């Protein structure tokens, strides 16, 4: 996966996506215009590259679902929902952890299997991804 992953990061950089995604924040994956997954990362560029690799390799159920949607002609896109405002990695991770929970509880994306609790984003309820 390492080589394919690094090639994917380089491809995203060539496409001019580094300035948008090389930050800590909250991102989403969409099928058509519907948000189907929300995640957080200290470096969204690298995390989104991991998702591209997952879709290509079908390494998890959510990626197989996304690959099938793409195969059927539905566009799969990524977008930024929130950029971390805090300074320092520990503060950024706490900030985006809390914000991610807010976004997941608001949108209830079908591919998120962990729903962070409002009172403590480190605790969550689990659900399965139905086929």
Please give the residue ranges for each predicted region.
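Generic signature of intrinsically disordered, low-complexity, basic-rich segments
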Residues: 4-6, 63-65, 114
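Coupling/hinge elements of helicase-like and P-loop NTPase modules
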Residues: 108-122
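Conserved short loop/helix modules at catalytic or binding sites
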Residues: 44-90
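GIY-YIG nuclease catalytic motif and its immediate N-terminal context
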Residues: 1-46, 91, 122-131
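Serine endopeptidase catalytic core focused on the charge-relay Asp
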Residues: 99, 103-104
